[in-house]
Swiss-Prot record:
Its cofactor is pyridoxal 5'-phosphate. It catalyses: (sulfur carrier)-H + L-cysteine = (sulfur carrier)-SH + L-alanine. Belongs to the class-V pyridoxal-phosphate-dependent aminotransferase family. NifS/IscS subfamily. [2Fe-2S] cluster binds at residue 324. It comes from Enterobacter agglomerans. Its EC number is 2.8.1.7. This is Cysteine desulfurase. One of its GO terms (biological process) is amino acid metabolic process. PANTHER family: CYSTEINE DESULFURASE, CYSTEINE DESULFURYLASE FAMILY MEMBER.
Amino acid sequence: MKNVYLDNNATTRIDPMVLEAMMPYLRDYYGNPSSIHDFGGPCRAGLECAREQVASLLGAAYTSEIIFTSCATEATSTAIYSAIALAPERREIITTAVEHPATLAVCEHLERQGYMIHRIGVSEEGALDTAHYYDALSENVALVTMMWANNETGVLFPVSEMATAAHERGILFHCDAVQAVGKIPISLRATDIDMLSCSAHKIHGPKGCGCLYLRRNTRFRPLVRGGHQERGRRAGTENIAGIVGMGAACELADVHMPMMASVQEMRDRLETGLLTTIPHTLLMGANQPRTPNTVNIAFEYIEGEAILLLLNHCGIAASSGSACTSGSLEPSHVMRAMNIPYTAAHGSIRFSLSRFTREREIEWAIEQMPDIVARLRTLSPYWQQDKVQIAQGGLFAPTYG
């Protein structure tokens, strides 16, 4: 079997209905939405229709709370820099140790500028250290910025409760919801989240389009300045075709949300199939609430890069948080934050499904993985099955005889 795509947390295939919605704006409606003549009208209408569709999926109270951007990374940078510009006397930021680089890189930059960054840790299952979070909240904090769902493990964070706690101390709260939107129901009007980032290409929309949710009456400073677009909050002529595509993708995600139950069933089947047929494996976030589409399993004593290469040979696309994919000799920062031992962290593989995933594809992956792992372990200097000892009380605390 070929073309089994299980890397949907990286990007998704564009839905044919999304492409169909975009085509008129690539072919026929080429006017500038800011223009008052007839060529601008259809583009302006498409822009506002998409804004309504995005607001509906996010459960926003007002369509004006949606600001279109080029991507979620831009939205996240905008949120962070806006918050610190509005509270220059507050020189602390709270984030987590397992954020996406879009957040971590900005925080590292600000740390070099003199900001104190509180990086909230996680347990070995990826659960947030809430006690550490509450201790870090103070009048010196300008912003809390954290993800709703982790991109590597799928573990969900209690962002609604975290946002309420931040508000009680007068702190703005931003959420990176890239991996949550379209996979779990979201109602922002029922939360205290001030700002939220999301992306079109993670929900079967086009690349090059994202948005920032900005709660009404939240003070704001734009990052991209120039024209009056997006009510003066994000300058630059809008990517109308991309925005229309994002709107269509959001509407379809809303319609197909019930399908996430069947996606979760396939995810569970994949987990069970791999864990029961391959020894010395660990499911990341096994006992934590997770997105319904994400499986991250560590296969001990082998490298994730080698697994991916052999999977690709079998026509299966997946992803790894191990050293190879980042060009580093270390496992991913998420695996290290979870304190996953060396021999397991290097062999972690993420399989991420979508509503386009089929059961036969899951069965094909289950069939191929045992042989792949067995072949690689015969080449591993760490794999001496008759000498591996499992320490009492933990699957991954090996000693070598």
